[in-house]
Every structure is written in C-alpha cells, then in structure tokens.
C-alpha cells in the first residue's frame, strides 16, 4: 500500500497526520501527487517555466477538498515543470531533513499561499487580477526552496498574512462590482419537498451558473447555500 503524510488540515488522524488515507477521502496517491505538484510549482517559479495563472491554479488545486483527481494533478505537473520525475519531486517535497520549527513555518507560509491563490482564482474568473499578489506567490515559492533563519520565516509569515488580506479585498471588489453589495434577505427555514443541492464556499460565478441552470430548466431541485 502506498504511504502518505498529509497534515495540512485540522481533520488529520490522531491530530498528527493522515498516513494511509485522508480523513477527507484523499488517497495516498493523490496526496503524494499534490506534494509533487507543489515542488514542481516551486521549480517553475525559479526557472520561469509556468505562468502566474498556472501557479495559482496549482496551489488552489491542492487545498483540502478542492481536487482529488490524480489525472488532473499529473496533467498540472506536466504543464508546470518537467525537469524532474514525479517520484523525485515527491521525495523532495517531504522536507525530511529540516528543523521542525523551520519546517512548520515553511508549511504555514505555504498554506497561506494556497488560501491566497484560492481567492485570486475566484477573482480572476470575474476578470480581476493584481500583479503584486501574483508576483508575491512566485517569489515566495522560490524563497521556500532555500534555507533561511527562523526570524526570516516569521517575517515572511507576517507578509503572507498581509498579502492574504489584499487578496480578500480583491475578491470582495470583484464580487461587489459584478453582483452588487450583499443584502440581508429573508429566506424560508421550512423543510422542502424536493431534493436539494447544498453549496458551500465563495465561488459566486459558479453559483450563479448553477442558479441559472436550475431556474431556466425547471429542474426538480432546490439550491441551498451555506458559507
């Protein structure tokens, strides 16, 4: 059985890491390919072999519950960096030989980048982009390839949080410019008689497409939105 080591979310087995299969349902093969994709993205940022959009999509793809398709992840690796095999990229991504505190800071920064890229991706779908944020993602991926002092990682961690706030502001601008300001609305809390589609998240573009599909095709489903 293939081994894995995934500890990027709060659902991990025994509050340490998932080592056989993710509590989220992610397979070991998927987890290892995601590690390889992150490493490929770092090399792509270093050698300029992938676009900012590709790097953004790569990181977004690896957040919890975003994409468990091993075929999709392999294709993303092939588009991103081909200088090393998937096996080599996976081994390098394990971060075995680094100090625990440094490794933890690197991972925390990386998870911040993943969230940042999720916001950037949603904003980009609506036509909103910010070069400074894309440049930060690229430069930080390269920075994480190198060895630095703990205090330098702490400084970068603060900067990552700052950039994350800017990404949220960009997404808010994209959403309100496209759909208007949110308004408090009265909704029914009664039990419905039809099947329902439960939506969680903030991809308003896809949500609009789904709503249009449901209400123009007279589908026998209700749409429930939760954030």
Task: Go through the PLM ranges and name each one.
Residues 2-181, 186-194, 198:
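Long, compositionally biased, glycine/small-hydrophobic-enriched stretches that function as flexible linkers
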Residues 206-214:
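Histidine-anchored nucleotide/phosphate-binding helix
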